[in-house]
C-alpha cells in the first residue's frame, strides 16, 4: 500500500503541476477554403478533449482560396505543441502558428452589446460608452446597441460596467489575431 500511496501522490502532484502550467494560447491556422476543413479541425480538438474558448474563421485570399482559423485554447506548452503537430498533419492545413509564443501579435475582438435603459440611467450608459469608445449602432426610446472593438479585457470590462445598468444581450465575434512585423 505504501507504493500505491506514493504513486497516487506522484500523479496528484503531476496533475497539480500541469494545471499551474496551463495558459491561454492563440493559434492561427491557415487552411484551404474547402468544405469540411473546419469540421476536421474542430474534430481534432473535441476528439482529444481540448477546449476551444474562442473561434474565428474567415476567407483571407479569394484567389488562392485560403482561410484563417483563429482558435484560443488553454494548455501547457507541451499540450499546445502537441495540438500544433496534430493540426499540421491535417491535409488542408498550410500553416499553424502559436501567436502567443511565436512573437508579438495583435489581437482584437468585436462585440455587439444591447442595453435597455430608462430616463434615469440613459445619461450614464452614454457616458460609459463614450469612455470605452463604443459606437452606438442602434437606438430606440428604451435601448441602445453598442459596437465595441478592442482587446478582450476592454470588452469584458465594458460588459461588466453595463450589467447593472440594464445589459440585455451580447454577441461576440471571437478573437481575430495576426502576427506583427515581417514574417520570417
Annotate the PLM regions.
Residues 10-67, 72-184:
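Long, contiguous binding/interaction regions
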